[in-house]
């Protein structure tokens, strides 16, 4: 097939809902990552929460964001993608706006009625509901609004836009906070404006994709039943728990790294802007690393990615400088690229025959579990090594140790369980 023919297939292979849904996903990711880039700083420096409380709140928020898509896909199927997206964007608009209005006079009553920690946590649970619905809607639209011959390209476009949003979100936060001088609270308000505009885009331009043979509605009760079916698979659950160690290491980027940089390296550092380095590195090197690792077995690639990301924080332990922070994020991203694409391939092979779709729905659970642990762990390590031991850079040895322990457990797991023929660390396929 010629390049011109392939280009023609791409031009005609996607229906309008595909482009609208992915366009809105880009701005939703800008809002999410912009918020995430400044959230720890906002809680610690502006609300004066302790490091441990900051970590606990962020861990809870991240867990809800990444766990709820289990049910979010069910709701999207039942109510339709259009209504679900509109609901999600409105919910996020309200949540981000409330977060940016904590110091407003009209919030005085809520601040008096609740302690700050419970008020903030309650408000954060509102925008946390949004991604749980947006993710399955956009992924489902990509499947239904693209022809079979270009569907893989559709998913590549989807993941690329997610990473572009991950790059632009922290940049947006920095622009609002620094050059415009509007402060952190207005970062949340800009995030609210961003997702509200996507509500309007969905309202006026998105139409329900209705390709036959692709739509399967599952009840909430059935989704919960399926969850228990999956969780009874000991081998699968054990793998998810072990691989959660990657995300315990990874989420320190948003939990403890910004506080470490501003608290112990440079109090004026633009931590939010620097957090764009991870996603930008992914965009730049994804194709190259995919090519280099194409012959490495899926499990070996995942284990290697975990090891690389774990070692990344040792750079900051040995060189606690802004340059060390940047280098650590680049290496962290390289590890993320190495494992991410092969992870879903491996999960599909772990699933029993005929249950690949069901198991893939739970592939993101390590992300949620990792965030839930990463938050409190990062907060504790910051307080202990920073305020008690007065050697804050030593915390990164512990973070790296968690990842290295996870790497060793992955090797042990691979020696005990061989999911499918030739899926061990030392075999091809």
Q: Could you tell me what each predicted segment is?
A:
Residues 90-115, 307-320:
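C-terminal ends and interior cores of transmembrane alpha-helices
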Residues 37-53, 255-272:
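Short amphipathic helix-loop junctions that connect adjacent transmembrane helices
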Residues 133-147, 337-352:
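Intracellular juxtamembrane helix-capping segments at the cytosolic ends
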Residues 113-114, 175-193, 380-404:
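A membrane-interface helix-boundary motif in multi-pass transporters
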